[in-house]
């Protein structure tokens, strides 16, 4: 089994996350996608509660699976109640799914501090890594710039040209803006019904 792993805060999930997952299904030739709502040790604590972020990740998976089962959510990280490192998640999933054929999907914002990650060299050695960019006019979106930053060629870079940011969406939601165009409909409905990010 070829497994893709997409971890993130998902605070909240947006259409950029959805596009990344759909790209993985259609073009990366992986059998299954595991979405993991994480507590990133290198970022501020998420604004939404873990249970809400896991639920929104589940709604993201349901949206992806409307055209066939592909994505599922792991709550292993969120249930541990403290930050978990990516290498720990990958090793856990290797054991659970009995496969070492894992591909790590990360956003370019997280990639920029990749060398601060625990065991980042081991991640490169053991797993395929695909970095997804948000927009083409960002200087960091150039393949050569990313290669220079990491000094390694064992990854791919794919630019989705979707300049969406959960941080910016949270700010807009706190100001009372309507962000329904940037967020998958079931997730938007959940945010409104549960009065998140107000």
Swiss-Prot record:
Pathway it belongs to? Answer: Cofactor biosynthesis; NAD(+) biosynthesis; deamido-NAD(+) from nicotinate D-ribonucleotide: step 1/1
GO BP, one example?
NAD biosynthetic process
Enzyme Commission number(s) of this protein: 2.7.7.18
Function, in words? Catalyzes the reversible adenylation of nicotinate mononucleotide (NaMN) to nicotinic acid adenine dinucleotide (NaAD).
Task: Output the Pfam families linked to this UniProt entry.
Answer: CTP_transf_like (PF01467)
Q: What class of enzyme is it?
A: transferase
Among InterPro entries, the record links this protein to: Cyt_trans-like (IPR004821), NadD/NMNAT (IPR005248), Rossmann-like_a/b/a_fold (IPR014729)
Question: Which SUPFAM superfamilies would you find in this protein's record?
Answer: Nucleotidylyl transferase
The record's Gene3D superfamilies line, in alphabetical order, gives: HUPs
Give the family from UniProt.
Answer: Belongs to the NadD family.
Does the keyword ATP-binding belong to this entry?
A: yes
- Molecular function (Gene Ontology), one example: ATP binding
Keyword vocabulary terms for this entry = ATP-binding, NAD, Nucleotide-binding, Nucleotidyltransferase, Pyridine nucleotide biosynthesis, Transferase
Give the reactions, separated by semicolons, that this protein catalyses: nicotinate beta-D-ribonucleotide + ATP + H(+) = deamido-NAD(+) + diphosphate
Q: What is this protein called?
A: Probable nicotinate-nucleotide adenylyltransferase
